[in-house]
Amino acid sequence: MEDEVAALVIDNGSGMCKAGFAGDDAPRAVFPSIVGRPRHQGVMVGMGQKDSYVGDEAQSKRGILTLKYPIEHGIVTNWDDMEKIWHHTFYNELRVAPEEHPVLLTEAPLNPKANREKMTQIMFETFNAPAFYVAIQAVLSLYASGRTTGIVLDSGDGVTHTVPIYEGFALPHAILRLDLAGRDLTDFLIKNLMERGYPFTTTAEREIVRDIKEKLCYVALDFEQELQTAAQSSALEKSYELPDGQVITIGNERFRAPEALFQPAFLGLEAAGIHETTYNSIFKCDLDIRRDLYGNVVLSGGTTMFPGIADRMQKELTALSPSSMKVKIVAPPERKYSVWIGGSILASLSTFQNLWCSKQEYDESGPGIVHRKCF
């Protein structure tokens, strides 16, 4: 595909938006999925104040703005703000005219039908896209790992899903959703650090804790054993320098926060951990394909980036599964962006080019066309 007609691939996550061109091996733009509006009108006189800010700009001006996340738990809940994010993606980040490029968007598993239609409508009517496609995030992650069958554990900032996929098709009856993800772990780490006497209260400080989480946290293979080790020596302690120069020490918080993925009770949630949820998802599938699923458990999303998570997952899932089963956890190093990468691969396949939903088809059939063309 020549560069001028390269398709655009946009993966809209609850926390970050990833965007770029089909055929590239990584997204060109990665920015927070936030829209900020000034708290007080006319405070910044002469600043040429805008009525809204998106992404990094909203993040850097957050002191004077009210921030909103238009995507909650993976699902778009505020379409006006979502439109602003897409506008920002096309015109400010990628600097392209959307009417000149096919657009591939991603959606959460179990996204309501009305939502897919709304997405389709906005792309064709507001942005005049020549062609459009919407793909399920977890399916793209599986493609990115070079598979068409497997179960994807996709955990981002706002939501976690287990999605069994057979021969390229997600099995909706067996998809499970867990409302526990990166944002909750950051909150939990804030709580743990409070107990140590380090208060983090503002949204700015919350970003610092997210950074601590990403740099220092890991998943213990044996939680109780790790707690004992941490209590008996300072071997597991690490220090972190705050922006103001203060240095804080963090010990068992390093593995206590991510442990909530396996023990949601830590957060007061009556949910199954990610290992049990994966097992339950597999159990809802046909007996004949379970072996293929156990042997292809693919991790995807930023919240699966903790060191030690694959080994722990291997251990827990093996303990739950029938003894004859071979469990294999696949943790690609680029899994933070594997949804986007899968989209880039799909949209640049020559065999995919006749699967796009065109503007003409949309004009003839309306938004419902998306259910017939994209599945």
From Swiss-Prot:
Protein name: Actin-1
Major localization listed first in the record, in broad terms: cytoplasm
Enzyme class: hydrolase
One matching Pfam family: Actin
Gene Ontology MF terms in the entry: ATP binding; hydrolase activity
Family: Belongs to the actin family.
The keyword Cell membrane appears for this protein: no
UniProt keyword list: ATP-binding, Cytoplasm, Cytoskeleton, Hydrolase, Nucleotide-binding
Gene Ontology CC: cytoplasm; cytoskeleton
UniProt cross-references to SUPFAM superfamilies, sorted A to Z: Actin-like ATPase domain
Source organism of this protein record: Schizophyllum commune (Split gill fungus)
Annotated EC: 3.6.4.-
PROSITE patterns (UniProt xref): ACTINS_1, ACTINS_2, ACTINS_ACT_LIKE
Function statement: Actins are highly conserved proteins that are involved in various types of cell motility and are ubiquitously expressed in all eukaryotic cells.
Coiled coil: none
InterPro entries xrefs: Actin (IPR004000), Actin/actin-like_CS (IPR020902), Actin_CS (IPR004001), ATPase_NBD (IPR043129)
Reactions catalysed according to its record: ATP + H2O = ADP + phosphate + H(+)
Keyword hit for Hydrolase: yes
Superkingdom, natural source: Eukaryota
Cellular localization per UniProt: Cytoplasm, Cytoskeleton
